[in-house]
A protein has these predicted regions:
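Start-of-domain signal
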Residues: 1-51, 159, 174
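Residues in well-ordered beta-strands of folded domains
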Residues: 32, 78, 171
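Short beta-strand-to-coil "C-cap" segments at the C-terminal boundary of structured domains/repeats
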Residues: 170-176
Length: 176
């Protein structure tokens, strides 16, 4: 299991998929809760604040891409505003069926299929720039240049014939 105290990024990276019991949503998101949160689930229009560790299922030089804990910069967005990939939105809000909404304090591992990730970015790499409104989460290019380049080469490369699934370990915060 992903340990829940101390350094989230280190403990999330140490957890193996074999430790978790995954389920699959009707849209293809695989998910497992390492810790179920408490309180009210967020609603569309509300602000989500998360820490995440981003990894990939297919990379030659290691799987980890980026962690918000590295720079102590949680990712924030307004749910439903189109600024975030569909797979992450569904994982936070739930799908009304088997994928239950996350609750504050919860920690969930996600395997997001390419169809709910960054597929459109690969089709037109010019939309990649954060300044152009590409959906997040994306490693910040100025503060985490190497991680941004790794992300760009894996998910936003029109020359790449296959785009691997995205793995996110997500910790959802309450009001911050």
């Amino acid at each position: 299991m992903i340990a829940v105290g101390g350094n989230f990024a280190e403990k999330a990276a140490a957890a193996t998929s074999a430790d978790l019991k995954f389920q699959t949503s009707s849209s293809g998101i695989q998910w497992a809760d390492a810790k179920v949160g408490t309180g009210n689930a967020l609603q569309a229009g509300g602000t989500a604040t998360i820490d995440y560790v981003m990894a990939t299922t297919g990379a030659r030089y290691g799987t980890k891409i980026y962690s918000t804990a590295t720079l102590d910069t949680p990712y924030r967005w307004k749910l439903g505003d189109g600024s975030t990939i569909a797979g992450l939105e569904q994982a936070i809000l739930g799908d009304g069926a088997s994928l239950t909404p996350m609750r504050p304090g919860g920690i969930r591992r996600l395997v997001i299929p390419q169809s709910l990730g960054y597929t459109e970015l690969a089709a037109n790499s010019k939309t990649l720039c954060v300044e152009n409104g590409a959906p997040g989460p994306i490693p910040p290019p100025k503060q985490a240049f190497e991680e941004y380049q790794r992300f760009k080469n894996i998910y936003c490369n029109p020359e790449r014939q296959y785009q691997p699934d995205i793995v996110l370990d997500v910790k959802l915060y309450g009001q911050r």
